[in-house]
């Protein structure tokens, strides 16, 4: 059975981060379920730049599924929606407590994970302009940060979304599959470490 990913979407989510991650996971053979965290339960999500995405289901219907990872795209308005959703916050906490992977990109780490103190010891990165919202002892200025101690994956923004997606494939389907997907994307040799 292939790995299962739950990708959360909210009004104002950053579309490049969401779509790139979803696309790469599917290419990597990972089954993706998209969940709307919109307060009205609407499945049509208007992202940060006006792109509309259609979620598979409201989070309330899929939160208890058997997923290996939960993914939180950035976009400040979307991340604020995540932060303000008791169901989303509790779902992320459940993933963490059960030893499953939590992945957050861009504004999501500083806006969702830190205020709710979900990872008090996890190393993380995020959107550089929000660096001051992440405790200095946890901040790493890297494109992608994987903290295996707490199963936390974080990344910086739209320009790091491919790296983020490939790291998720590496974690769920193996390095060989990540290399295969990187090759399909015509990634320049030397830019991404799956070519090493």
From Swiss-Prot:
CDD domains per UniProt: GATase1_DJ-1
Biological function: Protein and nucleotide deglycase that catalyzes the deglycation of the Maillard adducts formed between amino groups of proteins or nucleotides and reactive carbonyl groups of glyoxals. Thus, functions as a protein deglycase that repairs methylglyoxal- and glyoxal-glycated proteins, and releases repaired proteins and lactate or glycolate, respectively. Deglycates cysteine, arginine and lysine residues in proteins, and thus reactivates these proteins by reversing glycation by glyoxals.
Reaction catalyzed: N(omega)-(1-hydroxy-2-oxopropyl)-L-arginyl-[protein] + H2O = lactate + L-arginyl-[protein] + H(+); N(6)-(1-hydroxy-2-oxopropyl)-L-lysyl-[protein] + H2O = lactate + L-lysyl-[protein] + H(+); S-(1-hydroxy-2-oxopropyl)-L-cysteinyl-[protein] + H2O = lactate + L-cysteinyl-[protein] + H(+); N(omega)-(1-hydroxy-2-oxoethyl)-L-arginyl-[protein] + H2O = L-arginyl-[protein] + glycolate + H(+)
Post-translational modification Cysteine sulfinic acid (-SO2H), affected residues: 106
Keyword Membrane in annotation: no
Organism superkingdom: Bacteria
Subunit details: Homodimer.
Listed EC numbers: 3.1.2.-, 3.5.1.-, 3.5.1.124
Protein's name in the database: Protein/nucleic acid deglycase YajL
Listed Gene3D superfamilies: 3.40.50.880
List of catalytic residues: 106 (nucleophile)
